[in-house]
Structures are given as structure tokens and as C-alpha cells.
Regions:
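The feature captures the beta-strand-to-loop junction immediately N-terminal to the Walker
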Residues: 39-41
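Helix-to-loop junction immediately C-terminal to a conserved catalytic motif
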Residues: 54
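Conserved ABC ATPase "signature" region
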Residues: 116-143, 191
Length: 251
């Protein structure tokens, strides 16, 4: 699959955990913009791919090239964040005793001043407006003064997504965003990710095939650390190897 102007490229990437190859000689270009899903059985290497891209896990071999010009496989996670790659993990990592606004404040100035000074830092009017804008885009503006721990599970996930995009990353990495959500929250999350994907690139690791079908721009399938198929959802579900290895297990 030819990709012009990829946002990130992996070249012969390998990751080993105590002799086990979690990622095995992966080479792939990911296109910019849209919502790109990475699917596969447990242990396929999906989350590890995200970990390598954001610097949380170092590859034993290979290169990770960001925006066709910068190798990032050896950079620290905080450096990668400042380059425009943001990560949202499966479980929300918000500050539950702080308000929604305070969480957003911490996110917008994180990395720009020492942590112990964050709560005293005053925001500019531009930053305050940006917080309101992002909260509104994720339907959280009405909860701006609410204690974040009082939010529903879905709202906590949306708050963390808001925190992840407040500094306008070019690439957002999301791990199983709909786990534990109600059907209504799942649909809303998909719509929010599609909205975000209109302006930036979103990678999503997910198991729910209905969610993937409804909200994917493209799908990459992994198995035992390797990429076995990629394309749109129709391409993937009609691929015989995918049916045998992955989809058949869900029947």
C-alpha cells in the first residue's frame, strides 16, 4: 500500500521482551489525517507499536521516522511529546480531585514549567480560550467547574482526550478508548475521534470490530508481532488470513 507524505514510518522495527518478539521486523508507512485502527488478537503487538512511536518502549532494531525527516526511536518520551505526538492510555490518567478546568490547565502548560509550579502558573487569555474551545468540541464545556472524579467513565475518557489534544499534536495515539463505555458513549467517542481526525492523525488500538467498522479511515491488522494486512475495513474483513487468524476467533 503506497502512502504519500506519511506522518510516521517504521522501518524493520523489532521489539523483544525477555526473548519474545513483541514486534517482529515491522515496516509500514502511516498516512496523515484520519482515524487509523490497529487490530489483532491479544499479544499481537498493537499497543507495543504505539509504545515505540511515543518513546515508552525502545526498539531493539529498526527506525521510526516522524514526518519524513526525524528519527525518533532513541528520543525520550517528553521530547517526542514536544515534537507533536500525544498518547492517551486505556485507563484515564486524569487528576480526579481537580476540576475539569484544572486538569486542562495542567495539560496546557505541562512541560513548560516545573510540575510543582504548575498550579501557580497563570494562563494567558489565549490559553483560556483554547481550553474552552477544546472542552466545547468534546461536549465538556458545561462540566468545566466539575470535579473530574465525579464525571462518568465516558466523560473521563473524553477529558483525557481533551488533555491530549490541547497542545495541538499532529499525531494522537489512543489505546482501547471505548472499554467500559455504554453504547451511547461508544458512538459519541467514535464521532469525537472522527472530528479530531479531520485535522490531525489518530491511531487507535481497538478490539471492538463494530466500532472499527463504523469509525475507521483505514485498518492495520497485526498477528504475532507482524503486520498481515492493511486497507479499508472491507479489505480487511475479506482477507482470508485475517478471517482465519483474527475474525474467526470472535464467532
Amino acid at each position: 500500500m503506497q502512502v504519500e507524505n506519511p506522518i510516521v514510518s517504521l522501518h524493520q522495527v523489532e521489539v523483544n521482551f525477555d526473548g519474545y518478539k513483541a514486534v517482529n521486523d515491522v515496516t509500514i508507512d502511516f498516512p496523515a489525517k484520519g482515524v487509523h485502527f490497529i487490530i489483532g488478537p491479544n499479544g499481537a503487538g498493537k499497543t507495543t507499536i504505539l509504545d515505540v512511536i511515543c518513546g515508552r518502549v525502545k526498539a531493539a532494531k529498526g527506525k521510526v521516522v516522524y514526518q519524513q525527516k526525524r528519527e525518533i526511536q532513541n528520543l525520550k518520551p517528553e521530547k517526542i511529546v514536544h515534537m507533536g505526538i500525544s498518547r492517551k492510555f486505556q485507563n484515564p490518567t486524569i487528576f480526579p480531585t481537580q476540576t475539569v478546568y484544572q486538569n486542562m490547565k495542567l495539560a496546557i502548560i505541562s512541560g513548560k514549567s516545573p510540575f510543582w509550579y504548575l498550579v501557580q502558573t497563570k494562563l494567558t487569555n489565549k490559553q483560556k480560550h483554547k481550553i474552552d474551545e477544546v472542552l466545547d468540541s468534546l461536549d465538556l464545556l458545561l462540566y468545566k467547574s466539575a470535579i473530574s472524579g465525579s464525571l462518568s467513565h465516558g466523560q473521563k475518557q473524553w477529558l483525557e482526550i481533551a488533555m491530549a489534544i490541547i497542545n495541538e499534536p499532529d499525531l494522537l495515539l489512543v489505546d482501547e478508548p471505548i472499554a467500559g463505555m455504554t453504547p451511547k458513549e461508544r458512538n459519541k467517542t467514535g464521532e469525537l475521534l472522527q472530528k479530531i481526525g479531520q485535522e490531525r492523525t489518530v491511531f487507535v488500538v481497538e478490539h471492538d470490530m463494530k466500532f472499527v467498522k463504523n469509525f475507521s479511515s483505514a485498518v492495520t491488522v497485526m498477528h504475532e508481532g507482524r503486520i498481515i494486512c492493511r486497507g479499508d475495513f472491507a479489505d480487511v474483513v475479506n482477507n482470508q488470513e485475517v478471517i482465519e487468524i483474527y475474525l474467526g476467533r470472535q464467532e
